Structures are given as C-alpha cells and as structure tokens.
C-alpha cells in the first residue's frame, strides 16, 4: 500500500472514530429519566464544624414568614427593609462583617459561596424554628439587575409577593418569572454537553460556562452514594450524574420562597454537609454559588410532584427530571399572577410578558439608578 493511501486511510479511520464518539455521546436519551437527588450524601472531610452563630433573634414563634437577607457592606443602607417588617420577620446577615465571638446572632462562618452561605447558615442554626408561614430568601441590595420588576426594585416585589399563593402548589417558588439568563429555554445547552464543555475551556473566565460544565460532577458529589460512587443503589432510584443530553432547567438568580415543610423534608445534617461542601471546596465563590442556584429547587419542590414511586411496591424511584424541569420553569404569565397578582397580562410568551422585565445592558444597572428611583 502506498504511503499516501495509508495516510488517507488512517485519517478516515480517525475521523470516523471521532464522529462516532460525538454521535454516541450526544445520542437521544430516554424520557422520564430519574435521578437519586432526594438526599444530600456528601461526607465532609473536616472533623470540626463551625459554631452556631447564625441564630435569627425572635424567630421562634413568629407568625410571619422569615425574610432571610444575604448582604455585604457594599450593598449600602438597609433601611429599605424596615418597611417590610410588617410583612416579614427580618433575618439580615452581613456576610463580610467582622466576627463577633460574643454573639450567636446573624453571622456566617465564612464569606464564601455568595448567598448560599447565608441561606444554609439560616437553615442550620434556625432549623427548629422555621416559621409555619415559610421563608423568603433574597440578596441584600434593593435595586439589582435580576429583580423581576420594571424598575428592578426588590422592595416593590416583596411588598406584592403573595407567599401563600406562591407556596400553595409546590411548596417552593423562585421569585423570577422572566426566563432571561435562566436555563429554562429549550435553546439552553445541557450542562453536560460537549458544547458546554468546550465553552468552559475556550472561555475560562465565563463563570456561567464554568459552573454549567461542573454541574454534572457536583451533583454526583452532593447526591452520590457513600464513597463517591456515582451510581446510586437501586433503592435510591437511579443515578446521580447528568448525561450529555440531560438538562437541568432552572430559574436565575437564587431568590426564592419556600415552605417550612419543604425545608424540614431534609435533615439538618444535610444542610451542614452542603455548607461544608462550600467551605471545603476550591471553586470560586461565583462558581460554587451559581452551582447551588441549580440545586435549591431540586431540594425544595414538593416531592409528590415529581418523585416517582413504583405503583406496586411504593419504592422510591427517584426524581423525574422532565417533571422537575416543568415545575422549575412555569410560564411567565402564570408566575406573575400567582406571585405578584399581576394577572391577565397581554403579549406574553412562555418566558416573558411585555413590559414586566427587560434585561439591562451587560447585566448592570446605571450607577445612579438607586438615587433616581427611590
């Protein structure tokens, strides 16, 4: 065989092999895939755990929903929260404040993981006193680009929020209704896809790409069996790692309302383990915080809605991913009505309603926005 012919044959074989692998990895997956994401199984490596310093004063016995606020000093004055005290029991954590070793109140063990550190610390240190009315989890600045309100004003959203209606069906609801910058649209690439992996490599400074690409492995770390086995036992209902064509559809930006029962369906130790994953990990705050923004709805959406069970044995069969995605991304028109009483809106698509929200340029508000819109 001539050398040029041999070289051409080798190239054909290599090309065919690569093409086969690409097609195989991206082959259609069966519907109704189930995942054993019912319990946090991560095992912390640290022998010592942080002291409890995140107690919210006066929470025990409160008849109002808790408003859990994760803020930094740069968020500015928090006086805007005072007007909400009639509706909520305020639990405000300033995560970059110096530690007060004499106090057990409203402190976090470290400024890591963005809002997730505050949220988990609240659940851990107030586990026995979550209000019957539920809890709302938000960021500390009043005006933020992702607040789903024409003026991006969280005080308006929270004053209008109907907590009872929001929790009635599923026991959990993200505070955003518009789908922009979420993974709700079908056009958003699956987190484990080759497209996402390539994007993370080609644009390493893109935190969204980095967190999306890391999600399959992280879900295996958090929900996997003891010893890091990514194949959960049959009693846990399937695997824990996303395939290349499996997409977790989730709303942006880690502000949500959740019922007490949904928080208590997981043990306090699970929240401790999840917080330790942040404290012990090496990922950047943006990446770890964004990854957990994909996890909240997995933890809290009402189990009966998508935790499939065998009709004969009632054995646990895992979370149905398709149903989970549907619950995580309700139509915008339904969402605005359910959460904020903005009903019968016109010119609505699946993920937006005209005039309700507009994505600001570069995901930023003008520097003088707060001064001109208070």
Predicted regions and their residues:
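ER/Golgi luminal nucleotide-sugar-dependent glycosyltransferases, focusing on the catalytic module
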Residues: 2-374
């Amino acid at each position: 065989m001539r050398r040029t012919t041999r070289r051409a044959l080798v190239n054909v074989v290599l090309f065919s092999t690569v093409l086969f692998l690409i097609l195989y990895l991206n082959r259609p997956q069966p519907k109704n895939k189930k995942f054993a994401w019912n319990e946090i199984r991560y095992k912390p490596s640290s022998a010592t755990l942080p002291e409890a310093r995140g107690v919210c004063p006066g929470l025990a016995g409160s008849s109002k929903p808790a408003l859990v606020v994760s803020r930094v000093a740069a968020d500015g004055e928090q006086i805007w929260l005072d007007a909400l005290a009639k509706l909520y029991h305020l639990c405000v954590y300033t995560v970059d404040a110096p530690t007060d070793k004499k106090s057990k109140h409203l402190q976090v063990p470290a400024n890591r993981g963005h809002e997730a550190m505050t949220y988990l610390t609240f659940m851990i240190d107030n586990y026995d006193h979550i209000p019957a009315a539920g809890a709302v989890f938000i960021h500390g600045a009043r005006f933020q680009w992702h607040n789903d309100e024409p003026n991006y004003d969280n005080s308006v959203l929270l004053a209008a929020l109907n907590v009872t209606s929001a929790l009635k069906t599923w026991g959990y609801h993200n505070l955003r209704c518009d789908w922009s910058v979420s993974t709700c649209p079908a056009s958003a690439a699956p987190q484990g896809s080759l497209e996402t992996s390539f994007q993370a490599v080609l644009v390493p400074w893109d935190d969204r790409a980095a967190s999306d690409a890391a999600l399959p492995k992280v879900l295996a770390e958090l929900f996997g069996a003891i010893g890091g086995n990514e194949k959960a036992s049959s009693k846990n209902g399937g695997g824990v790692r996303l395939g290349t064509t499996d997409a977790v559809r989730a709303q942006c930006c880690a502000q949500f309302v959740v019922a007490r029962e949904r928080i208590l369906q997981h043990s306090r130790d699970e929240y401790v383990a999840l917080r330790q994953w942040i404290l012990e990990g090496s990922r950047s705050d943006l990446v770890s915080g964004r990854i957990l923004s994909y996890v909240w709805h997995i933890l809290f959406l009402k189990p009966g809605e998508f935790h499939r069970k065998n009709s004969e044995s009632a054995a646990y069969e895992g979370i149905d991913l398709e149903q989970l995605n549907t619950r995580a991304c309700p139509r915008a028109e339904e969402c605005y009505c359910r959460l904020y009483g903005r009903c019968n809106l016109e010119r609505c698509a699946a993920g937006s309603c005209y005039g309700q929200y507009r994505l600001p340029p570069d995901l930023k508000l003008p520097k003088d926005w707060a001064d001109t819109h208070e």
